[in-house]
From Swiss-Prot:
GO terms for biological process: methylglyoxal biosynthetic process. Belongs to the methylglyoxal synthase family. It comes from Rhizobium etli (strain CIAT 652). Substrate binds at residues 12, 16, 38-41, 59-60, 92. PANTHER family: METHYLGLYOXAL SYNTHASE (PTHR30492:SF0). This is Methylglyoxal synthase.
Length: 126
């Protein structure tokens, strides 16, 4: 991912509608970013805001969370917005925890819910 700032977008299944609505409502701010997203989330974001520059990776449980983690560790992702569903058990919960750990270790801005994402996004420089 050469050039430009990169924002990662991820949403658990029960939060994908929220992420699509977030992308639609914030398309102007998001259009300043290169976006990487897990597979299904990226598809939903593109459906909601087709003009955004979104690269879809694998689905989260199939390695997409780990792909984004790798991009964080190499400095290719500058911020993470991850709409987490805390009420549904996730079979790939260890991957999710590892991803959040990497965001903390590499000290990138991270929003885990809509309210934080709304506050964070305008403060980020693309």
């Amino acid at each position: 991912m050469a050039g430009g700032k990169c924002l990662a977008l991820i949403a658990h299944d029960q939060k994908k509608d929220d992420m699509a609505a977030f992308a639609r409502a914030n398309r102007d701010l998001l259009s300043r970013w290169k976006i990487v997203a897990t597979g299904t989330t990226g598809g939903r974001v593109l459906d909601a805001a087709p003009d955004l520059d979104v690269t879809r990776l694998k689905s989260g449980p199939l390695g997409g969370d780990q792909q984004i983690g790798a991009l964080i560790s190499t400095g290719e992702v500058d911020a993470l917005i991850f709409f987490v569903d805390p009420l549904t058990p996730m079979p790939h919960d260890v991957d999710v925890k590892a991803l959040m750990r990497l965001a903390i270790v590499y000290d990138i801005p991270m929003a885990l819910n809509h309210a934080t994402a709304i506050k964070l996004l305008p403060t980020l420089e693309a």
